[in-house]
């Protein structure tokens, strides 16, 4: 009976190696194709955003005037006649059109001005340092240079409440009264622990980076602008033209970056606010939403102080 033994020098079949090489080749081609597709989509998105942003200036011209406040211009829109002049300051990341339903009605009885903080709406970007203290200084210069005379009634929403309080403390003779609409008090920030603040800042930083990149490639414009009216409470009170303009202008990369910068600097002027002079015997109205944040009792306590 014969037995067969394999030679130690026998060569393995080349088929498995060939299949492996073929698989690696096709995998590389697929990955390269996906990379090329991603680059193409990114370039197309960036081009789309650039083209649309160029057209925004033509489609949505500023309703007011641009006033130089020291190296950059701020947008100021005033209507109506009478005194005192009402100055409307929008909330975090918002601009003058947020008052689109309020300003025309209030202007039937007095002078009403709405403005855009630096980098928002139609205003040009300003210094990198964005804080309520900086906002108050720029607002005072804006009103002075534009020729809008006081005394002013300051109407401030959200984070702008800090700006209004600093403005009133620094220029008491130019303020006739104040209306705070869901204004944020510095004590709300101070009740958070260092761990909570750090966690909040980390989450915001991650969110900021994601939104910035989405905006640069046109994704925010595509997704946010059409959806804005359906997710923003009170938007039904605005005209269709105003709703469209807000959705488009808020989706621009510049708008988003400056809005995020405002949020990052939300606590920068808290020490000044703690020592700010009170409004005294001048009229003060505090408006709070019936559906507010979870720490509303704490907010109410300090808004009455």
What are these regions (language model features)?
Residues 156-160, 164:
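Gly/Ala-rich beta-loop-alpha elbow adjacent to hydrolase catalytic centers
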Residues 98-100, 123-129, 190-191:
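Conserved catalytic-core motifs of eukaryotic protein kinase domains, centered on the activation segment
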Residues 72, 78-122:
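Conserved HGGG/HGGXW glycine-rich cap/lid loop of the alpha/beta-hydrolase fold
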Residues 77-79, 117-155, 171:
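Active-site loop/oxyanion-hole signature of alpha/beta-hydrolase fold enzymes
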Residues 2-84, 108-110, 305:
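Alpha/beta-hydrolase fold catalytic core
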Residues 132, 174-175, 179-305:
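Flexible "cap/lid" subdomain of the alpha/beta-hydrolase fold that forms the substrate-access gate
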Residues 87-91, 157, 182:
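The conserved beta1-alpha1 loop
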Residues 166-170:
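Active-site signature of alpha/beta-hydrolase-fold catalytic machinery across serine-
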């Amino acid at each position: 009976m014969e037995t067969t033994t394999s030679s130690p020098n026998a060569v393995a079949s080349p088929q498995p190696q060939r299949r492996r090489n073929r698989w690696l080749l096709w995998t590389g081609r697929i990955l390269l194709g996906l990379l090329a597709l991603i680059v193409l989509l990114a370039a197309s998105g960036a081009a789309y955003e650039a083209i649309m942003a160029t057209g925004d200036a033509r489609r949505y011209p500023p309703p007011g005037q641009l006033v130089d406040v020291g190296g950059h211009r701020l947008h100021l829109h005033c209507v109506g006649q009478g005194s005192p002049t009402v100055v409307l300051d929008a909330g975090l990341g918002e601009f003058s059109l947020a008052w689109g339903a309020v300003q025309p009605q209030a202007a039937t009885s007095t002078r009403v001005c709405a403005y855009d903080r630096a980098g928002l709406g139609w205003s040009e970007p300003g210094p990198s340092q964005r804080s309520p203290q900086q906002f108050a200084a720029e607002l005072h210069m804006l009103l002075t240079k534009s020729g809008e005379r006081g005394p002013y009634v300051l109407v401030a929403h959200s984070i702008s409440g800090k700006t209004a309080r600093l403005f009133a403390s620094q220029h008491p003779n130019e303020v006739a009264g104040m209306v705070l609409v869901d204004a944020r008090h510095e004590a709300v920030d101070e009740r958070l622990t260092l761990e909570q603040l750090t966690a909040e800042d980390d989450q915001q930083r991650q969110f900021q980076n994601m939104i910035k990149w989405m905006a640069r490639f046109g994704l925010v414009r595509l997704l946010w602008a059409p959806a804005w009216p359906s997710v923003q409470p009170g938007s039904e009170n605005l005209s269709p033209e105003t709703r469209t303009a807000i959705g488009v202008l808020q989706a621009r990369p510049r708008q988003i970056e400056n809005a995020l910068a405002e949020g990052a600097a939300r606590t920068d002027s808290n020490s000044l606010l703690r020592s700010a002079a009170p409004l005294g015997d001048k009229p003060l109205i505090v408006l709070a939403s019936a559906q507010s944040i979870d720490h509303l009792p704490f907010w109410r306590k300090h808004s009455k102080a």
